[in-house]
Amino acid sequence: MFLGSHTPRLDDKGRLTLPAKFRDELEGGLVITKGQERCLYVFPMAEFTRISESLRTAPVTAKALRDYSRVFFSSAADDAPDRQGRITIPAPLRTYAGLTRDCVVNGANTRVEIWDAQRWQAYLESQEESFAELSEEVLPGVI
C-alpha cells in the first residue's frame, strides 16, 4: 500500500527519485501512465497487469472502454527504478502532467501519483471545502 506525500525534484534528464518507502514495491517493475486531473499514475507491474486483464475481458463494443483504453495504454511506459531509486519519466508524460523541477509524489493506496508541485497545491485548495462532504458520500459509515 502506498501512503504519504513526498517532494522529490525532477532532474534535467527527466528522472525522479522515488521515496525510499515506495521502492520495494516498485523494484520488480512499474508502469507510468496518464492519470486524472493531469497527474501521472505509477502502478507496480502486478497491479498494472491486474488492471489490464480486467480491461481485456470487458466488451470491446463499449465505446467508453475503447476511448479510455486507447489513452491509458498508448501513454503507458514501463520502467524499473535504478540503484538510486530513480525512474525516468518520458517527455510526453512530463508535458501532459506539466512537470517542472518541483514535484509531489503521493501514495494513493494501490498506485503512486506524480504531480507538478504547483498543480498539486491548487488541486488541494480546490478540494478542501468538499473533502468533508465527499467523505459522507464515499465512506458512509466507514469512518
UniProtKB/Swiss-Prot annotation:
Record-linked SUPFAM superfamilies: AbrB/MazE/MraZ-like (SSF89447)
Alphabetical keyword list: Cytoplasm, DNA-binding, Repeat, Transcription, Transcription regulation
The keyword Nucleus is assigned to this record: no
The SpoVT-AbrB domain, residue ranges: 5-47, 76-119
Subcellular location: Cytoplasm, Nucleoid
GO BP annotation list: negative regulation of DNA-templated transcription initiation
Pfam families the UniProt entry points to: MraZ
GO molecular function terms attached to this record: DNA-binding transcription factor activity; transcription cis-regulatory region binding
Chief site of localization: cytoplasm
GO cellular-component term (any): nucleoid
Transmembrane segments: none
Keyword Cytoplasm recorded: yes
Subunit comment: Forms oligomers.
Family of the protein in this entry: Belongs to the MraZ family.
Protein name as it appears in the record: Transcriptional regulator MraZ
Classification of source organism: Bacteria, Bacillati, Actinomycetota, Actinomycetes, Frankiales
Gene field: mraZ
